[in-house]
């Protein structure tokens, strides 16, 4: 594994001299040709950006030989150590410029224009084009993207909409607590020990469908609908089978009828068929209803708004469902993992949650506003374990970064994983320390938190995910002490999103009943 045993220093270079503060113990950084900031007035050419070479196929051969496919985040770190804070790399026929300094990221995003373009996953595009599937904001661009995005923002990003999600997500989180208590009862050992990744997938799917449709699918019941489980499995398979086709033309995989392509297409087929079935069923159910005593969900609001054609609504609902399972569940698993490794931090978070419960008198909508450290722990988790290892933009106009002129239409990628592990931006970067995000200094946080992207093209489900994770963690911290069975690092692998290299086995120890008695629920007297 590249990160283990890789002895590196800070990659930020000034006047071609490495900083003295090491990120990892070991040999110093090779500055590379032009790795520093040039003092000349005119920018240097694109070809002068440090690079492993211009033959993309030779580069790809070495990349694959080193098993870089599932360790691309470590590959980025290694290249920054070799070439400095900016480099370009061509793998196959795709060339990118990579940066990691938050100031460079700020420059990039400030020039992205009103309709930013980002990298589209090639096998996803190939599937949608070949099977002529409808597309939503994930794949759209220019005015078509903007029209859909403006409408969707009103339903899933606006504060007035977000508050409607609280009771829905609180109910799902409480049912997850019941799942853990069932596991404890089944093991009959006073605690639950095991891998909860499948339960987290079901929790995430139940959460996103609850928000979208305003009703529950029952994914946290003892008996789970096998068809709904098929959707969850398909999302995982879709991510997993994407990786081999990132650097080779997906059409080759399709023409040669490879298992990778067949599995990938089959996964998307299930995603579309199930999402369409859910949407159609809830659409007809909603048409029969007249009295809504609770928020009826995003789908109902979109249909009632008459601002998007039904086919556009279907496409965007499909993308929201597909994007709301593995991403959120993985972040929660990493957060639990970090809390279990850092029990003092866990106790600080629990104390904040209990104080918030008392102050809010059990009102979850108020509670989520009273847990800044808990929210910071989510930021800290995404710093160490970002869902996406890079954020990408195709630049609209020529752009100068670190005194190199980058031509328009070039793909520039902000290496979020490498940035999060860089000591120049995050002192003691391997330490899980949520308090670092509570500092008010712009120098501490400016463009350092990019867990959900940035700007108008940031993650559409950001507010849902943040609220979902906050409510989940509140409930878990109130009810359980979380530990891990092994203190050894599980490592990470790239399956389009970052995942643990091996299963994480947790211990969930119920807190004493007298502790729970100090936690009033909404409506309780205090």
UniProtKB/Swiss-Prot annotation:
In what tissue types does this protein appear?
Answer: Expressed in the kidney where it localizes to the distal convoluted tubule and the thick ascending limb of the loop of Henle (at protein level). In the ovary, highly expressed in interstitial cells (at protein level). Also expressed in adrenal gland and testis.
Q: Where in the cell is it found?
A: Mitochondrion inner membrane
Q: Signal peptide span per the entry?
A: none
What topology in the membrane does the UniProt record assign? Peripheral membrane protein
EC number, as in UniProt:
1.14.15.6
Sorted UniProt keywords: Cholesterol metabolism, Heme, Iron, Lipid metabolism, Membrane, Metal-binding, Mitochondrion, Mitochondrion inner membrane, Monooxygenase, Oxidoreductase, Steroid metabolism, Steroidogenesis, Sterol metabolism, Transit peptide
Q: In which pathway does it act?
A: Lipid metabolism; C21-steroid hormone metabolism; Steroid metabolism; cholesterol metabolism
Q: What induces it?
A: Induced by FSH or pregnant mare's serum gonadotropin in ovaries of estrogen-treated immature rats in vivo.
InterPro entries annotated for this entry?
CYP11_CYP27_families, Cyt_P450, Cyt_P450_CS, Cyt_P450_E_grp-I, Cyt_P450_sf
- Entry GO terms, CC: mitochondrial crista; mitochondrial inner membrane; mitochondrion; perikaryon
Q: Which cofactor does it need?
A: heme
The UniProt function text for this chain reads: A cytochrome P450 monooxygenase that catalyzes the side-chain hydroxylation and cleavage of cholesterol to pregnenolone, the precursor of most steroid hormones. Catalyzes three sequential oxidation reactions of cholesterol, namely the hydroxylation at C22 followed with the hydroxylation at C20 to yield 20R,22R-hydroxycholesterol that is further cleaved between C20 and C22 to yield the C21-steroid pregnenolone and 4-methylpentanal. Mechanistically, uses molecular oxygen inserting one oxygen atom into a substrate and reducing the second into a water molecule.
Would you tell me the protein name for this molecule? Cholesterol side-chain cleavage enzyme, mitochondrial
Lineage, highest ranks first: Eukaryota, Metazoa, Chordata, Craniata, Vertebrata
**This protein's encoding gene:** Cyp11a1
